[in-house]
Amino acid sequence: MCGILAVLGVVEVSLAKRSRIIELSRRLRHRGPDWSGLHCHEDCYLAHQRLAIIDPTSGDQPLYNEDKTVVVTVNGEIYNHEELKAKLKTHEFQTGSDCEVIAHLYEEYGEEFVDMLDGMFSFVLLDTRDKSFIAARDAIGICPLYMGWGLDGSVWFSSEMKALSDDCERFITFPPGHLYSSKTGGLRRWYNPPWFSETVPSTPYNALFLREMFEKAVIKRLMTDVPFGVLLSGGLDSSLVASVASRHLNETKVDRQWGNKLHTFCIGLKGSPDLKAAREVADYLSTVHHEFHFTVQEGIDALEEVIYHIETYDVTTIRASTPMFLMSRKIKSLGVKMVISGEGSDEIFGGYLYFHKAPNKKEFLEETCRKIKALHLYDCLRANKATSAWGVEARVPFLDKSFISVAMDIDPEWNMIKRDLGRIEKWVMRKAFDDDEHPYLPKHILYRQKEQFSDGVGYNWIDGLKSFTEQQVTDEMMNNAAQMFPYNTPVNKEAYYYRMIFERLFPQDSARETVPWGPSIACSTPAAIEWVEQWKASNDPSGRFISSHDSAATDHTAVSRRWPTAAARPANGTVNGKDVPVPIAV
């Protein structure tokens, strides 16, 4: 992952301003340690910190069209760049970068090209001919992007809020699937898939087609000019990613460059469930497996760094980010710069165990839609920033646009958990890859029940965090929590401890408003809490202690007050109930 910073329309154009923007851009250097770039045009600045994955020798940014009148700074990967280049026969490309195509697409089609991109991205593009600019973010929000406003009327964009929080009067999370245009002065949605309407589809389940689409999603993410691997926890999602990647490795140029042995990575406390399961999958797939251990104390020691990089105080996100943060450092030390991961499956297919209680297929579908729409606030945020903290890029095939469209078009009746029919969570994916003739995985792995990542690395991890924070936060501090933190008040000592660190690092009102909050049980949205009466009374941050599922489905997922309420969810030009100084046209 790269880091981008754009500042447009500043009042002061001086050497001091240029130096300040370079200084702020350096706050993103962990995301892109390979090279730094800056383009200045009058009162507009586009900065870039590069992590070189494609065309390491000539793909430095910012990137340009032929006459350098169009400038773009990009964080992301465009998987269909070769196909798009073929449509631009009259254009001359200067580099082998997959992202250069964005400048030429704008030149050819104007602002209406973003839905042509297949990939993960956030970018800012400046047209120097009239000083207009656009900014856009990928469909689901895999790549982070923040937008801010300076007192001088300047507009700011950054991959992480740490690069703009000190200089902007106000800033927000840039919404996924949106484009900002300076010509209209507002945001508009470019990604409008049928499932956004939450209308219940009736398409029958086609196991082979679903398998084919997922394999295509994994294969396109093997596009790389640097060493890579797969994050393997031993659960269904990461195991399927590893299996497909291993099976198709010899069809790509990766095989010729780095060999035909897939590298896999796992982290956990000694004796943790993930380590054992991942080792078994790695042995089955004959991967080059790397197993990392950490202690509870090492995780606790990293908490402040984790909160600084992830930019959240959400309890569940911090719990899961810490092992991933530690693992990414180890991965980078091996010379690996890109990994493929399994985020998104649970949201698409209702894989969290609380989905056992969905009363009907309509509510099941609506909950999956809500979960996908909020991924950029949780798992995408974690996966991207925990890896980017050490200059590693994470790719997520489950969040492929085409795959999501196919998966969300299946009649949700097929996703409902029905034990009398032998259907457990994510049954449609398990069945799609249940191939006796050419097995992808052993049966017991294919049908292994889900572990929350923060539990899978070792149950003592969460217990250790709770014990540690219990000692750091007094009862008196909790009694005054509402006075100290009137916005999103912490409901337990672990949440209070993380909030203290966050407020010290990011004291701005806008910063705390980027973190969603609200009632949640086992990672549910507030609406799903209505499914079970007992859930409404719980604020225990660990789903391990909630008897909300039948005995065959003991949930190890987390419980917290972590979801955006209606007042906290960006919509119709408001964020957390306050006006955003741009209109949003949906």
Curated annotation (Swiss-Prot):
GO terms for molecular function: asparagine synthase (glutamine-hydrolyzing) activity; ATP binding. Keywords: Amino-acid biosynthesis, Asparagine biosynthesis, ATP-binding, Glutamine amidotransferase, Ligase, Nucleotide-binding. Residues 2-185 form the Glutamine amidotransferase type-2 domain. CDD domains: Asn_synthase_B_C, AsnB. NCBIfam families: PRK09431.1. The lineage of its organism: Eukaryota, Viridiplantae, Streptophyta, Embryophyta, Tracheophyta. Essential for nitrogen assimilation, distribution and remobilization within the plant via the phloem. This is Asparagine synthetase [glutamine-hydrolyzing]. The record marks 343 as: Important for beta-aspartyl-AMP intermediate formation. Its EC number is 6.3.5.4. Pathway: Amino-acid biosynthesis; L-asparagine biosynthesis; L-asparagine from L-aspartate (L-Gln route): step 1/1. The keyword ATP-binding applies. The active site is at residue 2.
